[in-house]
Amino acid sequence: MLSVLNRKMLTLVSHCADMLELCFDDADAVNDTPYILHVQSSFAIWDEQTVLFENRDFYTMQSGENDSGAGQPFAEKLASLNQKLNGCCVAKAVVDRDWLCIGLDNGVQIEIDTDEEEKNDETWRFFKLDDTSPHLIAYRHRFEWIH
């Protein structure tokens, strides 16, 4: 299923709490439904030998904090990452039972490690953003389709 990512364009890197969200879309389709990758395990986004963003960069707000985002190091890092990656196309997507690696056409690598999580903890979820497509869910050493 992840082969559908080949030549898709990365259009957004965002987050929800401590979950990374990557959105992929066709570069030349007008009304295409995007694919979403939710990452809940260890990950790193690399450019050569430099880590651009990783799971340790996430900041979870405490109750009572304002979510203005502007001027916050986390928000600035995410905005900078979007500037660098927005519009890059997937050159390759490789998955095995312990990790997922997505290589972009600008040389940036997105590496997701599934081997660190507990056996039944969801590590990542890949799906088309519609109401009918199944979700591919990765757990430690196994995959599952959810309809």
Regions found by a protein language model. Give the residues of each.
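Surface-exposed, interaction-prone regions used to assemble/regulate multi-protein complexes
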Residues: 1-147
